[in-house]
A protein has these predicted regions:
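Conserved short strand/loop->alpha-helix "switch" segment adjacent to the catalytic nucleotide/phosphoryl-transfer site
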Residues: 14-38
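Short amphipathic
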Residues: 1-5
Length: 127
């Protein structure tokens, strides 16, 4: 889905992600996926320069979900370690903690930042 590069697109991307995961019977990863899509879209909207839109793509395999956010800025994100009193800068720390894998790739128009979740459900204790 392509959205305007504005803050309200974060909420729209979360709702669309929830709808897709429900349809794909992946509701068990909805909370983590919502946080990841929120962080990735927020990063693009706040830090990508000269962009009008962001594109959010979701891809599901047998055991994984990939969330990818594309924008037209060719500059790759620079994760940093926030200071003790910083109120921002924690996005990629959260992405790293939630995702089984994440990265950045070049696209024709700019870049795509992606994060993957393991979608296998843990089985409960046996009887």
């Amino acid at each position: 889905m392509t959205l305007p590069a504005v803050s309200r697109s974060v909420r729209l991307s979360r709702h669309a992600t929830h709808a897709a995961l429900t349809a794909w019977q992946l509701a068990h990863v909805d909370e983590a996926a919502a946080l990841l899509v929120s962080e990735l879209v927020t990063n693009a909207v706040r830090h990508a320069e000269g962009i009008d839109v962001v594109t959010v793509n979701l891809h599901a395999g047998r055991t994984w979900l990939r969330i990818e956010v594309q924008d037209a800025d060719r500059h790759w994100p620079q994760p940093r370690i926030p200071g003790r009193y910083d109120e921002s800068g924690f996005g990629f720390i959260l992405v790293d903690a939630l995702a089984s894998n994440w990265g950045v790739r070049e696209t024709e128009a700019g870049k795509a930042v992606w994060a993957e979740l393991d979608t296998r459900q843990e089985s409960g204790p046996g009887i």
